[in-house]
Amino acid sequence: MSLKQHTQTIFRQQFDRESDITIKAPGRVNLIGEHTDYNDGFVLPCAINYETVISCGKRGDRQIRVIAADYENQQDIFSLDAPIVPHPEYRWADYVRGVVKHLQMRNADFGGADLVICGNVPQGAGLSSSASLEVAVGQALQSLYQLPLSGVELALNGQEAENQFVGCNCGIMDQLISALGKKDHALLIDCRTLETRAVPMPENMAVVIINSNIQRGLVDSEYNTRRQQCEAAARFFGVKALRDVEPSLFFSIQDELDPVVAKRARHVISENARTLAAADALAAGNLKLMGQLMQESHISMRDDFEITVPPIDRLVEIVKSVIGDQGGVRMTGGGFGGCIVALMPLELVEQVRTTVAQEYPAHSGGKKETFYVCQASQGAGLC
C-alpha cells in the first residue's frame, strides 16, 4: 500500500469521511556545499523520493486535528483561537503546531482541518525528515485554503517554526529544497538571496545515500564552535559573511589569522567555489569533474573543517574504489557520523552495495550500513 493510500485509509477510519486532498513533501540530500548555508553561501541539494504525505480535509470549526500514522495513530487536537504552545508529550506534534502558529503570524487566513500524516523519510539520518514534515503541513493548509504563499514563503515558515517553536537551529536549505525541488534536477541555492537555479542531472544516474550508522556525537557543540569560528573569520575580513571573501584575498593573508580559524574559513571559501563549479559540471554531464569536486569537498571537510570520522572516511574510500571517475562521493550533513552521498551510474549500484557490505563493518566496529538508492524528485505538491 502506498503512503497516499495508507493516509487516505486512516483518514476514512478516523474521521468517517473521505479526505479532500492528499499532498506530499520530500526529504533531501545535499550533493555539495557543506557548512556554507549559514555563511550566506551556496548549496546544491536535490529532493529525494522519500517523503511526508498528508491526507487532509477542511473542518467547519477552528480546530486542527492531527493523526500521526507512524506513531500508532497518536492524536493531537488544538484550537486556532487559543494560544498555540508546545505539546506536553508528543515531540512530533510541535512541528505541526509550530508551522500552524507561524502561518497565523504571517496573517494567513485559514480555518480548521483534519490531517493524517505518514512518512518514509529516515529519521536521524540527516535527510531532513523534519523539514519535509514542516513543508508538508504548510502545503496542506495552503492547498486546502488557497493561501497566497509562494514556495519560498512556505519554506521560510517551516524554518521559523523549527528555529523558534521547536527550538532547533537550522539554515533554510532543507525547507527550500523540499518546497522547490524539481524532478531529475538538483537545485543550486544562494543562501543569501534564496535565488535558485535548477541543474539537470545526467540520465541513468543514481543518487545513493549510505548511512554509516555511526551516531553523530558532539555534533551540536562542534557545530556551534564551527559557526563561531566562521563568524570570527568574517569579522577579521570586515565582511558580513565568508561568502564575501574572494579566494585570492583569503590566500594572500590567511597567515595573519588564527591557524584553526584560517582552516575553517579555507573550507567555506573553497567549498563555495566548488559548489558553483559543481553545478556547471553536473549541467554539462561532466561526471569526472563532478567526482573531483566531491572528493575535494570531502578532503576539505576532513582536513580543514575537521568534521569527519575514520569510519566515514573509509566508507567514502570504499565507494570511490568501485566508481572511480564515473561519479563522486563524499560525506554529507553536519558531520561526526551520519551519511555519505554518492552519484554513480545505475549499473554500478549493486556492485557498490555488495562491496560496502563486505568491507565496511571491519572499519566501523561491526556496524552495518543502511543503503538508500534515490532519484532526484519533485518538491511539495499534490500527491
Curated annotation (Swiss-Prot):
- Name one cellular component (GO) term: cytosol
| Site entry: Transition state stabilizer | R28
Ligand binding (Mg(2+)): S130, E162
What keywords would UniProt list here? ATP-binding, Carbohydrate metabolism, Cytoplasm, Galactose metabolism, Kinase, Magnesium, Metal-binding, Nucleotide-binding, Transferase
Which amino acid positions bind ATP, per UniProt? G124, A125, G126, L127, S128, S129, S130
UniProt xrefs under InterPro entries = Galactokinase (IPR000705), Galactokinase_bac (IPR022963), Galactokinase_CS (IPR019741), GalKase_N (IPR019539), GHMP_kinase_C_dom (IPR013750), GHMP_kinase_C_sf (IPR036554), GHMP_kinase_N_dom (IPR006204), GHMP_knse_ATP-bd_CS (IPR006203)
Matching entries from Gene3D superfamilies are given as:
3.30.230.10, GHMP kinase, C-terminal domain
EC number(s) per UniProt? 2.7.1.6
**Name assigned to this protein:** Galactokinase
- What taxonomic ancestry is recorded? Bacteria, Pseudomonadati, Pseudomonadota, Gammaproteobacteria, Enterobacterales
